[in-house]
UniProtKB/Swiss-Prot annotation:
The keyword Iron-sulfur does not apply. GO terms for biological process: glycerol catabolic process; glycerol metabolic process; glycerol-3-phosphate metabolic process. It holds the Pfam family FGGY_N. Transmembrane segments: none annotated. GO terms for cellular component: cytosol. The gene is glpK. This is Glycerol kinase.
Amino acid sequence: MSEQQYIMAIDQGTTSSRAIIFDHDGNKVAISQQEFPQYFPQPGWVEHDPLEIWDSVQSVISNVMIKSQIKPYKIAAIGITNQRETTVIWDRHTGKPIYNAIVWQSKQTSDIAEQLIKDGYKDMIHQKTGLVIDSYFAATKIKWILDHVPGAREKAAKGDLMFGTIDTWLLWNLSGRRVHATDVTNASRTMLFNIHTLDWDQDILDLLDIPQSLLPVVKPSSAIYGYTGDYHFYGVQIPIAGIAGDQQAALFGQAAYDKGSIKNTYGTGAFIVMNTGLKPTLSDNGLLTTIAYGLDGQTHYALEGSIFVAGSAVQWLRDGLKMFDKASESEQMAVDAKTTGGVYVVPAFTGLGAPYWDQEVRGAMFGLTRGTERGHIIRATLEAIAYQTKDVVDTMVKDTQLPLTALTVNGGASRNNFMMQFQADILQTPIKRAAMEETTALGAAFLAGLAVDFWEDQDELRKLSRIGDQFDPQMDPQKAADLYRGWQRAIAAAQFYGKD
């Protein structure tokens, strides 16, 4: 493979779109980023304009090509990674969306999800899709749009409409409106996809009255989906060859290819994903079963746990309690405090995610005394992020019976050395921090590169996915166990208070 060639990754996130060009050594050559508007038509509703998303993607592609000075024919392939679950329905003839994109965290379809639970479909949907019934996933969003947009049901019945998660919407536009497809990771987040048969599930489609003609073709994560349209890249047809949802792309970018490998992406919340190998593991403890990636004719599965509040707890200390001016200051203040002074912070501002799934519980502080200082509360808040991670990781180990050997980490809060050391101590496991921040985009690039033989195999990719720092446990195991017991008491007390 000529060393003159490159891979482009499109990373379409919840608040911004990015295009990144990588070379053959997995180095970042150029990056462009652009934010786009968020819409909140009613409390709890979150929407995007799909045309604004597409405009932002075209803009970052153009900018990154200008920045890098790379000719289009030198781009060997394009990979796409995306905010998952966000739902677009558009007219296949005009290419125009019939409604805004309903974003993953939007609550406007909660009533549909609650009705499905009341009607007794919880076990059936969990068995088939690996997911819990929730408005988070695409299924209820599709039904809502079909039910609420005038004429949508009639158009859908005639086969005039197309559904896609954001990857599908971008692929359709990027391919000159020729390819309507998605990958197995994104399909597995719709609550319509049977993770055992690897096909759309007719029983669930019938239940929600969703015509199959609406749905994209499902392909492996690493495959040539199609080629760029004539009006992009000066007419050079570049293969679009890799697609994965953002958390799965981060797993792939961190080379977590072995069964039992776990990664944690610390963002506003935190997403912990464990590669469980070639067979799905259904969790008895509130974790989601999902698809990690599809590659070389094989489907790899994963368990996922979401923590609602991670980095946003630090923002709360900064913006809500005015404890410091910059989030980065929290690290030194936590170190200077030396201990939490017996304080535990449960940052359940919007309830608790995995493995508790408790919507009623609210944030709380325990162990306050007259001697409690600002530093104690800051340190306890950072420690809470590590405790929540342990809650999920321990559940994964319990569900799979696989040993925990290390946790690879990326995302903003992973740059906090104090927190990463405490994470290693409380898990009693080494923490490996990614050298590159853009591991999600790198994962999409890896998937695309494999499909066009830019890279040979996963062994080559392991060498390119570099670890920056490793944090080994330094705390006495008994002390770590005692601290964690205190956390479990704090959670139980917060849940008790949240009950009517």
